[in-house]
A protein has these predicted regions:
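PLP-dependent aminotransferase-class I/II
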Residues: 1-3
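Glycine-rich phosphate/pyrophosphate-binding loop at beta-loop-alpha junctions
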Residues: 5-7, 15-113
């Protein structure tokens, strides 16, 4: 019921502490990267990390344990869909407009509805 519940989106958006909670929960991604690299390569860090930045949870989890590691180059990519001028794009950083989602002011892809 809206008067006693709150929907928490699974993205790194909204007021604190929700983005931090999502990032910490998704940090299992970078834990697994460290574990597999150590097993297969004998080191726990990659040269590069590449992640998509849609809602942010995948990227946050991927870089979580490497964010302060200067040995790792981090590359974040935004989905372009069929191009920014196609009308079929999810390029929020490029095409988004300020809006409110879950009490947080951020860039959004939205229409009048």
């Amino acid at each position: 019921h809206p008067s006693d519940t709150y929907y928490i989106i699974g993205s790194t958006v909204g007021p604190h502490p929700y983005p931090d909670m999502v990032a910490r929960l998704q940090s299992v991604i970078s834990e697994e990267i460290k574990k597999q690299l150590l097993e297969k390569e004998g080191r726990d860090h990659p040269d590069y990390l590449i992640a998509c930045v849609g809602g942010g949870s995948n990227a946050a989890g991927t870089i979580y344990h490497y964010i302060d590691d200067e040995r790792v180059k981090i590359v974040l990519a935004e989905a372009g869909g069929k191009g920014i001028d196609s009308g079929m794009s999810a390029a929020t950083i490029h095409l988004g407009h300020l809006g409110i989602i879950h009490g947080s002011k951020t860039l959004l892809m939205q229409n009048e509805d």
